């Protein structure tokens, strides 16, 4: 199989629950061509967006928000959310850097992890509902399209957030008994400046398709959220691992949706100047 096709296919095996099959050879190719992260995000975003569009025609807002969340985790899995809970345990641990790293890598779930997981899920739900509520006034009968485009942009932004935090991060030191790199370290090593730039440009272009330049606002905000998370990971752990990269995915998605909702509100109040919403 062509190396690019293998990397693209492996992206779905690595970033989603779609049963395409995945091998170590495929993972190696994906890490060499990690710019496929936002490409895979675009495909997943289309699927999620279609569900959001159809659901907006049928279900009440709160029900649809819950259904969208369910479909997102059905198609992407809970691995990234597991990273959120691990990061929460590490953030809440007291003591030295070593103790924090130990809590981060501990397989048991603590209070900090539970709290962080709940907060992220609540924020995800709230961000979807905010887009719905603010979008009614701005888009009216075109609200289903807004939901489609918002979920599409959010998923592309989530995957680019993973690429962003990996591109600017450095891996945590390996454990003494670990002789091979983990998936987090492999991701960081693969996120070269060239791969980051290719992925970033692709993501920026596709996020502009539904809304014009306004589509860049949530995309850039998600990337910035990844850098903020990286700063906190350095402060608490002295580096970055796969849990931090997975957390960037969840935070990036939520950040994009929140910024879309805020942008809608500001545009309705006339605070966006010459920027106008455009429909694909």
From Swiss-Prot:
What's one Pfam family the UniProt record gives for this protein? CobS
List residues traversing the bilayer.
4-24, 34-54, 58-78, 108-128, 136-156, 197-217, 254-274
Which keywords describe this protein according to UniProt? Cell membrane, Cobalamin biosynthesis, Magnesium, Membrane, Transferase, Transmembrane, Transmembrane helix
Which cofactor(s) does the record list?
A: Mg(2+)
Catalytic activity, reaction form: alpha-ribazole + adenosylcob(III)inamide-GDP = adenosylcob(III)alamin + GMP + H(+); alpha-ribazole 5'-phosphate + adenosylcob(III)inamide-GDP = adenosylcob(III)alamin 5'-phosphate + GMP + H(+)
Instruction: Give the enzyme's main class according to its UniProt record, as a single word.
Output: transferase
Q: Name one GO biological process term.
A: cobalamin biosynthetic process
The protein's annotated pathway: Cofactor biosynthesis; adenosylcobalamin biosynthesis; adenosylcobalamin from cob(II)yrinate a,c-diamide: step 7/7
Q: Which GO terms describe its cellular component?
A: plasma membrane
Is Hydrolase found in the keyword set?
no
Q: Where in the cell is it found?
A: Cell membrane
Q: What is its EC number?
A: 2.7.8.26
Classify the protein's membrane topology as the record does.
Multi-pass membrane protein
Q: List the disulfide bonds.
A: none
Give the GO molecular function terms.
Answer: adenosylcobinamide-GDP ribazoletransferase activity; cobalamin 5'-phosphate synthase activity
Would I find Magnesium among this entry's keywords?
yes
Q: What does this protein do?
A: Joins adenosylcobinamide-GDP and alpha-ribazole to generate adenosylcobalamin (Ado-cobalamin). Also synthesizes adenosylcobalamin 5'-phosphate from adenosylcobinamide-GDP and alpha-ribazole 5'-phosphate.
Family indicated by similarity: Belongs to the CobS family.
What is the name of this protein? Adenosylcobinamide-GDP ribazoletransferase
Q: What is the lineage of its organism?
A: Archaea, Methanobacteriati, Methanobacteriota, Stenosarchaea group, Methanomicrobia
């Amino acid at each position: 199989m062509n190396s690019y096709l293998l990397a693209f296919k492996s992206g779905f095996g690595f970033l989603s629950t779609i049963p395409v099959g995945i091998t170590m050879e495929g993972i190696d190719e994906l890490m060499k061509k990690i710019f496929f992260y936002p490409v895979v995000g675009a495909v997943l975003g289309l699927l999620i967006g279609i569900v959001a569009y159809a659901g907006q025609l049928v279900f009440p807002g709160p029900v649809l928000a819950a259904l969208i969340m369910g479909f997102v985790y059905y198609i992407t899995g809970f691995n990234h959310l597991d990273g959120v809970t691990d990061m929460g345990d590490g953030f809440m641990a007291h003591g030295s850097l070593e103790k924090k790293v130990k809590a981060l890598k501990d397989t048991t779930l603590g209070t900090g992890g539970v709290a962080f997981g709940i907060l992220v899920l609540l924020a995800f739900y709230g961000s979807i509902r905010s887009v719905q509520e603010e979008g009614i006034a701005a888009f009216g009968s075109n609200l289903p399209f807004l939901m489609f485009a918002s979920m599409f942009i959010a998923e592309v932004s989530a995957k680019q957030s993973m690429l962003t935090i990996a591109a600017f991060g450095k891996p945590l030191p390996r454990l003494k008994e670990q002789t091979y790199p983990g998936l987090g370290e492999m991701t960081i090593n693969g996120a070269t400046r060239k791969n980051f730039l290719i992925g970033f440009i692709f993501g920026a272009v596709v996020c502009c398709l539904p809304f014009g330049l306004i589509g860049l606002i949530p995309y850039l905000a998600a990337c910035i959220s990844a850098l903020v998370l990286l700063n906190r990971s350095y402060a608490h752990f002295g580096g970055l691992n796969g849990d931090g990269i997975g957390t960037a995915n969840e935070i990036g998605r939520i950040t994009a949706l929140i910024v879309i909702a805020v942008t809608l509100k500001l545009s309705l109040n006339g605070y966006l100047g010459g920027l106008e919403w455009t429909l694909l």
